[in-house]
Amino acid sequence: MSGEVPPNINIKEPRWDQSTFIGRASHFFTVTDPRNILLTNEQLENARKVVHDYRQGIVPAGLTENELWRAKYAYDSAFHPDTGEKMTLIGRMSAQVPMNMTITGCMMTFYRTTPAVLFWQWINQSFNAVVNYTNRSGDAPLTVNELGTAYVSATTGAVATALGLNALTKRVSPLIGRFVPFAAVAAANCINIPLMRQRELKVGIPVTDENGTRLGESTNAAKQAITQVVISRILMAAPGMAIPPFIMNTLEKKAFLKRFPWMSAPIQVTLVGFCLVFATPLCCALFPQKSSMSVTSLEDELQASIQRTHPEIRRVYFNKGL
C-alpha cells in the first residue's frame, strides 16, 4: 500500500512476519543496508520525529505507508531499541558490511607475520568491542573497568589464537594457513561478546509480556540471548573467511597476481564484501530479534513473581541484541 497511511499500523514491530526465517531475513536486509550509514543527522531526526509522532497518534498530512516504513527503518538503523539513544556510527548494523569487509580482507591478506597478526587482530577486536557494546540488550550501562576487561581479554584471546595456530600451520599447506584468521575471530567472539555483555549476565536483561509490559530482569534470558548472538556472529563471519581463501589460493598462482601482487588485498576485500552482503542479514535472521522463553525456564524468584501477578503468562519476551 502506498496511499495515505492508516492510523493502526504497529511500527513497534518489523514490517515482515518475524516468526519465519524469510520474514526475519527481509527485515535484516533492510536494517543492515550499508546505505543507511549515509543518512544525515537531519534525516535521522526527521525519521525519529515521524516514528514518535505516529506512536502517539499524530499522522503528518500526506504521509504514505511506504514513507512511514522508510522512516521506521531509518530510525531502527540508528537508534538503540531499548534505550532510544543514537548509536555510534561504526557500531550500527548498517556499518557491518563496509567495516568488516575491510578489516576481514586485510586480516586474511596480512596473516603471515607476527606484527601483521597483532595489528589486524587488535583492529578487529577494537571494532568488535564497539559493535558488541552498541548492540547490547537492555539499558544497563557497563563500567569503564568492565569495558576495559572485555576489550583486553578478547584482544588477547584473538591474538593468542592466531599466533598459536600460525605456529602450528607452518608445516602444513598454505591453504590451511589461510583459515587461521577465522579461527581467531571465532575464539574472540566467544570471549568478547559475553564479556562485553557481562552486566547482563550479572543483573539480567528486561523481559516483557507479548505486549511489551516489563515483568522484571532475567539472567537466564541473558544467557540465551548471548549464546544466540555468539552463534550468529561466528556463522556471519564464516562465508567471508572460508570461501575467499580457496579463490585466493588459486588466483595467487596465476600470472596476473604474480605480476601485480598489490592487487591481492583489494581482491580479497571485494570477495569478503560480496559474502558479507548476504551473510550479515541472513545470520542475523537465524534467531528472532524479539526472542522468547518459557516462564518455567526463568529464575525461581522471577517465576514466582510472574505467576503471582500475571498467572496467565506462559512465555516472556526480550531483545536478544545483535
Curated annotation (Swiss-Prot):
The protein's topology relative to the membrane is: Multi-pass membrane protein
Mitochondrial matrix membrane side: 2-102, 168-174, 250-266
Q: In which tissues is it expressed?
A: Widely expressed, with highest expression in kidney and liver.
Q: Which residues carry this modification: N-acetylserine?
A: 2
Question: What is catalyzed by this enzyme?
Answer: L-serine(in) = L-serine(out); L-alanine(in) = L-alanine(out); L-cysteine(in) = L-cysteine(out)
Q: Which GO terms describe its biological process?
A: erythrocyte differentiation; iron ion transport; L-alanine transport; L-serine transport; one-carbon metabolic process; serine import into mitochondrion
GO molecular-function terms, A-Z: L-alanine transmembrane transporter activity; L-serine transmembrane transporter activity; monoatomic ion transmembrane transporter activity
Question: Mitochondrial intermembrane side of the membrane: what ranges?
Answer: 121-146, 196-228, 288-322
* Cellular-component GO terms for this entry: mitochondrial inner membrane; mitochondrion
State the Pfam families in the record.
SFXNs
Q: Which domain of life is it from?
A: Eukaryota
Query: Membrane-spanning regions, if any?
Result: 103-120, 147-167, 175-195, 229-249, 267-287
Locations listed in the record: Mitochondrion inner membrane
What's this protein's function?
Answer: Amino acid transporter importing serine, an essential substrate of the mitochondrial branch of the one-carbon pathway, into mitochondria. Mitochondrial serine is then converted to glycine and formate, which exits to the cytosol where it is used to generate the charged folates that serve as one-carbon donors. May also transport other amino acids including alanine and cysteine.
Q: What is the similarity comment for this entry?
A: Belongs to the sideroflexin family.
Fetch the PANTHER family from UniProt.
Answer: SIDEROFLEXIN, SIDEROFLEXIN-1
Please give the name of this protein: Sideroflexin-1
Naturally occurring in which organism (per UniProt): Mus musculus (Mouse)
